[in-house]
Amino acid sequence: MDSQEYIPQYKLILVGDGGVGKTTFVKRHLTGEFEKKYIPTLGVEVHPLKFQTNFGKTQFNVWDTAGQEKFGGLRDGYYIKSDCAIIMFDVSSRITYKNVPNWYRDITRVCETIPMVLVGNKVDVKDRQVKSRQIQFHRKRNLQYYDLSARSNYNFEKPFLWLARRLSNQPNLVFVGEHAKAPEFQIDLNIVREAEKELEQAAAVAIDEEDIEN
């Protein structure tokens, strides 16, 4: 019976400076807002995001900080028993990228070597402060990276898909059907192409140890 179907569930911690778009990102999912649960002792909201795949359903229980990061760091209880993580920064704010190593350090201190994705949100903005060629932290730490625009759904599913493949050990896993709400607007394709071109070029050159993160 369908009610007895086994659905793999993963705890996903979503971290990054306040205002980078973490909650907006989660709420783009069709079920992201309606089924959330609040954990007052940790000050977090847990959003169960379900995805249909060619191997059946899978679910990420996304822990969103609910603004707690503004009060200086997160409690270890937020990180404990996490299966994977997304670190988010805002490409229109250089300081949010400079703080990425701090978030990475906090995760690895508690969780060690869980799969992680670094995402640069708000790539739809015209005044991009963190250029694609400057984003190198993921290369130094062997993380996956994606440009993202939560409001336009650009690359919305890619972080989840990459993590689902890693966690299930199914490299051929794909998502089936729609999982995101209709986009708020259409992203400028010229901006997308230029950023993708820069990322490709950056990946082909040696890592610059003097880039803008520490």
Curated annotation (Swiss-Prot):
GO terms for molecular function: GTP binding; GTPase activity. GTP binds at residues 17-24, 67, 121-124, 149-151. It comes from the Eukaryota. InterPro entries: P-loop_NTPase, Ran_GTPase, Small_GTP-bd, Small_GTPase. Residues 36-44 are annotated as: Switch-I. Residues 6-170 form the Small GTPase Ran-type domain. GO terms for cellular component: cytoplasm; nucleus. One of its GO terms (biological process) is protein import into nucleus. Changing residue 196 to G: In strain: IT04. Changing residue 40 to A: In strain: IT04. Pfam families: Ras. It is found in: Nucleus. Residues 67-83 are annotated as: Switch-II. Keywords: GTP-binding, Nucleotide-binding, Nucleus, Protein transport, Transport. Belongs to the small GTPase superfamily. Ran family. NCBIfam families: small_GTP. GTP-binding protein involved in nucleocytoplasmic transport. Required for the import of protein into the nucleus and also for RNA export. Involved in chromatin condensation and control of cell cycle. Found in a nuclear export complex with RanGTP, exportin and pre-miRNA. This is GTP-binding nuclear protein Ran. It comes from Plasmodium falciparum.
